[in-house]
C-alpha cells in the first residue's frame, strides 16, 4: 500500500512538472507570436486606406475613425463581373459615433452648468 501511495505521489509530481514546462514553452511561443503580430500591425498601420477608396489590395488597411475602424466592404457593381472593395463605415457604427459625440457635447454642457 505504501508503495502504491509513493508511486502515485511521484507520478503526480512528474506530471505537474512536465505540464508546467509545456505551459512555459507555450507561453514563450505565444509571446514571440504576439510580438511578431505587433510588428506587422505597426508596419501595416502606416499604409491606411481612406474611406470610399479601393481596399482590395489589403482588406485590413482601412482608416480608424474616432471610435471604430472602417470595414472593407466588397460588392459586385450592377452588370459587372469584377468585385469592387471599398473602405466604408457601417451605418450602425456611424450612428453610434454620432450619439457618442452628442453625449460628450451634452456632458460638457452639464459640467459647465454645475461645475
From Swiss-Prot:
State the compartments where it is located: Secreted
Domain of life of the source: Eukaryota
Question: Which keywords, in A-to-Z order, does the entry hold?
Answer: Disulfide bond, Secreted, Signal, Toxin
Record propeptide residues: 21-44
Gene Ontology terms for molecular function: toxin activity
Q: Indicate where this protein is primarily found.
A: secreted
Tell me the tissue specificity. Expressed by the venom gland.
Q: List the disulfide bonds.
A: 55-72, 62-87, 74-85
Signal peptide as annotated in the record: 1-20
Of the GO CC terms on this record, one is: extracellular region
Entry keyword Secreted: yes
Q: Which family does it belong to?
A: Belongs to the neurotoxin 19 (CSTX) family. 01 subfamily.
The name under which this protein is listed is: U3-lycotoxin-Ls1l
Amino acid at each position: 500500500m505504501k508503495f502504491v501511495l509513493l508511486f502515485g505521489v511521484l507520478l503526480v509530481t512528474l506530471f505537474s512538472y512536465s505540464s508546467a514546462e509545456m505551459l512555459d514553452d507555450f507561453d514563450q511561443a505565444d509571446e514571440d507570436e504576439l510580438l511578431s503580430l505587433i510588428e506587422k500591425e505597426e508596419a501595416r498601420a502606416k499604409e491606411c486606406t481612406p474611406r470610399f477608396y479601393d481596399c482590395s489590395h489589403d482588406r485590413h488597411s482601412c482608416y480608424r475613425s474616432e471610435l471604430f475602424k472602417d470595414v472593407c466592404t466588397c460588392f459586385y457593381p450592377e452588370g459587372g463581373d469584377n468585385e469592387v472593395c471599398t473602405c466604408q463605415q457601417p451605418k450602425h457604427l456611424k450612428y453610434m459615433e454620432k450619439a457618442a459625440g452628442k453625449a460628450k457635447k451634452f456632458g460638457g454642457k452639464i459640467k459647465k452648468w454645475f461645475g
